[in-house]
Regions:
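Partner-binding and oligomerization surfaces adjacent to conserved cores of proteins
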Residues: 1-266
Length: 266
């Protein structure tokens, strides 16, 4: 088994992900943190001397490089995962007051599921552990390395550290993997900004390693998910019910034992 990372979702998002066997990527400009992947994370003020030997002024170079960084942000889609499945805050924020689901994904299997030409520049997403900073360090933006791009993609404020985020990052994903969300599809005449369009990567059943149900999960929804997953997605998946620990401010997973009707489909 490879590294397991977790996706926190409300019940509708979980059913979409499980039912469609896919992973949703969101444009970097559309995230809930305005600092995310922002061009100002990098410093373009110290223009290298060799760029100033011609007639082009320093201000032009600074504006150009900042625009390039902005375009990189607008051309990048990512999927946010977590190293942990028991964050009380994430269960509250992303699973609508612990009513949702946390899905464990085997990242080795996920990377093996990447479809052909998912990205126009890179064939596979980058897997980046988010780095949390107390200050904006603003490294030199003229160091033309992939590490510099990674800094823009993976740097967040210290306040977000509880999320223990790992990102799958794909610059310029192929348009063939773009699709409207169910909510967007309800408004077929609406004109959407291209950055509002999500991209979806199909997953094999073995990518789904575990499913954790929130403390306040609706029991009927829970049963529907278990039956669907065991019959049509991955019969070997592990199910857990999150419980409140009576002795500490933490959540404890409890194994969901299969019913006899479940075993008959194994």
């Amino acid at each position: 088994m490879g590294r397991i990372l977790y996706k926190y979702l409300d019940i509708d998002g979980a059913k979409c992900m499980i039912g469609n066997h896919n992973l949703q990527f969101t444009n970097a400009s559309q995230l809930n943190d305005p600092f995310d992947c922002h061009p100002k994370l990098l410093d373009y003020s110290d223009v290298p001397k060799h760029k100033l030997q011609g007639w082009i002024p320093e201000e032009w170079w600074i504006e150009k490089e900042e625009n390039d960084a902005l375009n990189l942000r607008n051309d990048t889609w990512l999927c946010s995962l977590s190293k942990v499945n028991d964050s009380i805050l994430m269960w509250a924020h992303y699973c609508y007051n612990h009513n949702g689901v946390c899905i464990g994904l085997d990242i080795d299997n996920v990377m093996e599921s990447v479809p052909p030409m998912f990205g126009e520049i890179y064939l596979q997403p980058f897997v980046l552990d988010v780095q949390y900073k107390s200050i904006i360090e603003r490294p030199d933006g003229y160091c033309n390395t992939i590490g510099l791009f990674n800094y823009q993609w993976q740097t967040k404020a210290k306040e977000w550290e509880y999320e223990q985020e790992v990102r799958l990052v794909i610059p310029r994903p192929s348009a063939m993997y773009a699709a409207l969300t169910p909510a967007q599809a309800k408004h077929p005449k609406e004109t959407w900004d291209w950055r509002e369009i999500h991209h979806y990567m199909q997953l094999k059943g073995e990518c789904f390693e575990s499913i954790y149900f929130g403390v306040n999960i609706d029991e009927q929804e829970k049963d529907k998910i278990i039956q669907f997953v065991r019959k049509k997605l991955n019969p070997h998946i592990n199910f857990y019910q999150m419980r409140v620990d009576a002795d500490a401010f933490r959540l404890q997973p409890e194994v969901v034992k299969p019913l006899n009707s479940d075993l008959s489909h194994g």
